């Protein structure tokens, strides 16, 4: 939520200001691909390394990239489930963020009791990611970014729309269709009526 110049400037004054911790956005996509998600972002690998250099603990926000890492497409989800069938897809992102030794805490936006229970299972105790798992998650990030989805996390900052459109719902439906490979090319396509009905009715 800030630019890199401000980050670097504030860290350059650590000897004087003595930061107790710094909050950064860190997840397995933003680790090396932050600019592909948002051109204003900086890779978490750089942000974290700068904190480590100064022995400043990191507080992690957006470990699930606004929930997107808990809603992977079926193909990517299956790859993670094959490795750890009993664990949620979200737990992979939390384990990634929690593996780094200078992480003080990982923030989690929880809506339901099931989210809290999943987080407790993931962190009590935390099983750090192996090098092989880091490689798998990097590959997952690269594959995820190849899908032509819209980077919407349903924050609703774009609402209300002056034309009465539910912008997040439209974008999320589009993303779901892309992820499922269910995008009709035109109104003559075999599955057009079915896809249209799914969008309008659910």
Region locations from a protein language model:
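Beta/alpha (TIM)-barrel catalytic core signal, keyed to glycine-rich beta->alpha loops juxtaposed to Asp/Glu
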Residues: 1-165, 169-172, 179-195
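Short, intrinsically disordered, charge-balanced linker/junction segments flanking boundaries
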Residues: 197-201
């Amino acid at each position: 939520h800030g630019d890199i110049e401000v980050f670097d400037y504030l860290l350059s004054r650590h000897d004087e200001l003595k930061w107790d911790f710094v909050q950064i956005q860190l997840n397995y996509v933003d680790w090396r691909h932050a600019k592909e998600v948002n051109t204003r972002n900086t890779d978490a690998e750089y942000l974290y390394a700068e904190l480590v250099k100064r022995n400043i603990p990191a507080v992690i926000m957006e470990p699930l990239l606004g929930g997107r890492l808990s809603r992977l497409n079926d193909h990517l989800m299956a790859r993670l489930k094959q490795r750890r069938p009993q664990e949620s897809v979200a737990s992979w992102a939390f384990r990634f963020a929690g593996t780094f030794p200078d992480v003080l805490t990982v923030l989690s936006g929880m809506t339901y009791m099931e989210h809290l229970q999943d987080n407790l299972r993931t962190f009590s105790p935390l099983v750090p990611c192996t090098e092989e798992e880091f490689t798998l998650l990097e590959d997952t990030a690269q594959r995820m970014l190849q899908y032509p989805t819209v980077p919407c996390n349903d924050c609703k900052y774009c609402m209300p729309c002056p034309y009465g459109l539910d912008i997040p719902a439209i974008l999320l439906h589009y993303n779901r269709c892309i992820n499922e490979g269910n995008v009709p090319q035109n109104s003559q396509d075999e599955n057009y009526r079915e896809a249209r009905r799914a969008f309008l009715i659910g």
